[in-house]
């Protein structure tokens, strides 16, 4: 069984290829993908070649961890059934080609326990669930740390920053301030204010959440903290982070790293989205057929007006 898939052969060398899929086992599903999202964080680092080395890293690879589709075959031990709408956070099913994280393909073979059933009415917006779960994890800490202070300042008004702000408002907490340097990204706020950093004079923030991925952000954020305040690093940083110690010492600043989402985070945001408490509207700005993936990835990574690019795989099946 073959599938069309996005393959990064090396940095900035991307194509659609026909790949042989691994055989499905008794606990596996075969899923036909309708839509997949392009990540401007992790996938951009893979595309540019700036991704820090980690176990399993290497080219060629199939990217993607934001895919939605329908089950077309289910193993005897699988709980999902044919016809179920599911979210797939990636797969490793391409033989010698690495899945990092393997979601950008027309068809996937994936372990039943790895996927999440979704309300089909979410449609293409369901590709945003991984980012929503990432935002949720930043403020929930996987339920392993209490208390966690919700953001009163968010740095970055991309999709992750918007979802973090929307989750804060949906929880009934005071609306956060959001910093964004790109004027074109100031639009789209839902119940909170977006400012240029220079227009904000506050220096008493209790919790600053950075989703910009700017490795120089600590020297910008720490002087804006109240004493005992916290900076949460919720982006992904390709370069080493450094900071001036004296301002951090004077404020007794805390620095916390938020890692990848866990299953409980996904279940929580799925319920919020399906109930309508968390809006996913207005976040997908660009669409492209999967056959045109080369141009779509370049647009996603170079056009500041592109918040989220979605590939449509339906014509490839």
Where are the predicted features?
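C-terminal hydrophobic helical "lid"/dimerization subdomain
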Residues: 1-3, 219, 263-317
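Glycine-rich beta-strand-centered segment in the early N-terminal region that forms part
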Residues: 22-38, 50-92, 121
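Short, well-ordered coil/turn residues at beta-beta hairpins
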Residues: 35, 89, 209-211, 313
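Short glycine-/small-residue-rich Rossmann-like dinucleotide-binding loops
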Residues: 37, 75, 91, 212-213, ...
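NAD(P)H dinucleotide-binding glycine-rich loop of Rossmann-like/cofactor-binding domains
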Residues: 86-155
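Adenosine-nucleotide cofactor-binding segment
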Residues: 154-157, 169-220
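N-terminal Rossmann-fold NAD(P) dinucleotide-binding loop
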Residues: 161-162
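Glycine-rich phosphate-binding loop and adjacent beta-alpha segment
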Residues: 215-277, 313-317
């Amino acid at each position: 069984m073959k599938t069309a898939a996005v393959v990064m052969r090396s940095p900035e060398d991307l194509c659609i290829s026909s790949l042989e899929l691994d055989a499905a086992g008794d606990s596996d599903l075969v899923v036909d993908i309708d839509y997949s999202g392009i990540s401007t964080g992790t996938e951009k680092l893979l595309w540019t070649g700036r991704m820090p080395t980690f176990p399993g890293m290497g080219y060629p690879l199939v990217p993607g961890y934001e895919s939605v589709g329908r089950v077309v075959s289910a193993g005897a031990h699988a709980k999902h059934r044919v016809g179920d709408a599911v979210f797939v956070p990636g797969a490793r099913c391409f033989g010698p080609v690495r899945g990092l994280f393997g979601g950008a393909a027309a068809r996937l073979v994936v372990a039943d326990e790895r996927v999440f059933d979704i309300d089909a009415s979410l449609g293409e917006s369901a590709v945003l669930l991984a980012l929503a779960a990432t935002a949720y994890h930043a403020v929930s800490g996987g339920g392993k740390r209490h208390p966690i202070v919700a953001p009163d300042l968010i740095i970055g008004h991309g999709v992750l920053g918007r979802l973090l702000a929307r989750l804060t408002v949906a929880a009934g907490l005071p609306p956060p301030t959001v910093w964004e340097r790109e004027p074109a990204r100031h639009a789209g706020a839902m119940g909170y204010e977006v400012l240029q950093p220079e227009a904000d004079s506050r220096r008493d923030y209790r919790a600053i959440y950075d989703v910009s991925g700017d490795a120089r952000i600590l020297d910008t954020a720490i002087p804006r903290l109240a004493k005992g305040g916290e900076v949460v690093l919720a982006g992904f940083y390709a370069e080493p982070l450094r900071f001036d110690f004296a301002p951090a010492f004077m404020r007794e600043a805390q620095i916390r790293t938020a890692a990848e989402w866990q299953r409980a985070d996904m279940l929580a945001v799925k319920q919020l989205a399906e109930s309508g408490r968390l809006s996913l509207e207005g976040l997908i700005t660009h669409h492209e057929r999967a056959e045109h993936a080369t141009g779509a990835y370049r647009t996603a990574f170079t056009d500041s007006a592109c918040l989220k690019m979605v590939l449509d795989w339906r014509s490839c099946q």
